[in-house]
Amino acid sequence: MSEDIIDRSLELGIQCFQGEDYKGAAELFSKSLQLARSYTDRSLEGIREKVGLPKRCLHDPSRVYHPRYLVLLDNRAATWEKLNKLDRALADAAYMITVDAYNLKGYIRRGKVLQKLGRYEEALQVYENGLKQAGEAEKTHAIHAPQKFLDIVYRQRSTIKELLQSRARSSRSLTQQTVAKEPKLKRPATIDSLMPGKKRSSSKAKIDYIATLPVEIIERIMANMDTRSIIRCYSVCKLWKYRLERLPHLYQEFRLSCCYKNMLGYVNFVGALASRTAEYSCRSIQCVSGNVQEEEKSIILLLSRLMIGTRQLALMAKKCKAERIIQHICENKKLRNGVQRLSITAPVHFGHKLNLHELYTRTTSMTHLELVLNFHTPSEHVGGHLFPWQDHAVAETNLESFTLMARNYSVHHVNVIEQFEYSSVLFKRLKKLCITGIDFRLGDRNNLKWISDMPNLQELWLERNTGIEFHELITQIVQVGAPKTLRHLTFREPPNRHFDRMDQSQLGLGEEALREVFQSLESLDLMNTRFDPQLLLLLLQPACENRIARLNIGNCPRLSFARDLEILTLIFQQLPALTDLLLPNVMEYTRQGMEVLRKNIKGMKLKRLDLSFIPSLKGYELLDLLKELKGINPLGLETLTINGCTAVAPQTVDYITRNGYAQKVMCAYERTQWEHLGINSFWYR
């Protein structure tokens, strides 16, 4: 229990430090240190052994400390530095070396504090001692210091040496000047022969490089400038304006912030370029929310007065409504005709005014659309009606990719759901569809027929949507027999969904029908989804021609690593072409489940493995698995991810990388929170 208190206090202290509450952080770290010192030696030995550390300190077997003691000291020393209490920081840094003389953290902390105090000779000696101890640890105990710590020590040592040498040279030079100093005659002021009575300026005349340099050199200068710098240069004088306007091919990518003054300068700048070059257009324009007070009028200014086309337009707003953004895009002929990739991140206040029909009709060149919408809760007095799609002719679009993300649930979802009734026309060419956070219970689209109306769909991503069930999706696709080109399927249910007991036998899915529609499947992601394991086995069998290269079955409530060992064996045997296996937070993890994976890993081509958030995963179990894999592939894994695996010690991670079991290991013990919404993050970071 007290271990949990120490970890919790450490986490709270870090939060206080990040929130700049340094006094609160120092107090929390001090209390945690006091608690860590309250253990008996026998208790500390048990705790250290539990996390994979030696019972006693390697550098001094007579000492034993809590595993978190060094981290707590380091954090408190950093806090003292922020509070400008360098003497206390120095004391904590010195004690860090006493706690673990083989860890370079203490030497780095102590050296930097000494540098702040101006005691450079002592700091240099500290860094030298740290490198000496690191060498001894490697020679005696085969412990390799992390490369990033070695780089810091070498860099700081080099900096101090250069500083001391510079001081020595300056001191010698000053001494020589003092000894050899002689009186010198002052040079009389030079009189300019062309300007009688006026002294010639000793300083060099300033040169206007933009006015004098060749165009080729100006191009190289301007090519390395950001949008803000370009606009400022454009406003310097008429000559600069004249020369910059004649280089339109340089200005292809713009990143703007919502400052009205800067936005006005940008609009005038591209307007001048367009007036000189009729066919001028740029590659991309990205506008991010800066000044919230000026955001709406800045975005409206951009969309209404922009006189050029752009192939890619990304707008991120916190206040400006998506309804107005879409309206102004549709009204700007130059903009709507040229945009191919459109991304809008904005709030929605009135869903019935979100005129997607007009957007599809007018942006005829658009192939990629991304909508990230924050739906506001409607007021009771606001009356809105669905946009009458049936009253308008629905034109065929060129969309190849469509992403629809809702940050919150709302009755306004019905206004974006209705478009899927016309999937056979709107999304006939669609290859990638991503929908997350939508409540499909509000409309009539929860029968999923609209998905089978997209014959060219290759990638389908459905995450945290309400009103859509996984078994219903599979049944619909199989019954209709479309889409047959599906290569990537991701289905993740919302959290806290009701438990679904639907079994595969109740679906009536035949193996031949499954093979017909899922024979091209290359990746399958069912994280956090409740499904009958037999259904997963059926989905993998059609891909027996070794197409499945990526599988994510982490956090699946009905797939147990304790009770479903036979099914797991069959699943892993169906994956001979697998390169990416993701098993974060697997249900009911047991050693027997890991043994099933180890025995069947020989039949895979594994390059990347994710075993994050399995607290009971032991280091020796992981090593047994990696040794089995290295017997097949001498190069080992490209990437091993074990975030949140608290039972795997840092020494084990170091051993894995040192012996080539994995080229890159991602291991962060602090990542203990699932993320609310993250389409490419597996819900945690």
Swiss-Prot record:
It comes from Eremothecium gossypii (strain ATCC 10895 / CBS 109.51 / FGSC 9923 / NRRL Y-1056). Forms a SCF ubiquitin ligase complex which binds to DNA replication origins. It comes from the Eukaryota. GO terms for cellular component: nucleus. Its main location: nucleus. This is Protein DIA2. Pfam families: F-box-like. TPR repeats lie at residues 6-39, 70-103, 104-137. The keyword DNA-binding does not apply. Residues 207-254 form the F-box domain. Belongs to the DIA2 family. PROSITE patterns: FBOX, TPR, TPR_REGION. Keywords: Cell cycle, Leucine-rich repeat, Nucleus, Repeat, TPR repeat, Ubl conjugation pathway. The gene is DIA2. GO terms for molecular function: Hsp90 protein binding. F-box protein component of a SCF ubiquitin ligase complex involved in ubiquitin-dependent protein degradation. The SCF-DIA2 complex is specifically involved in the pheromone induced degradation of phosphorylated TEC1. Involved in DNA replication, genome stability, and the control of cell cycle, probably through its association to replication origins to facilitate the ubiquitination of another origin-binding protein. LRR repeats lie at residues 300-323, 353-377, 454-480, 499-517, 518-542, 562-585, 598-622. It is found in: Nucleus.
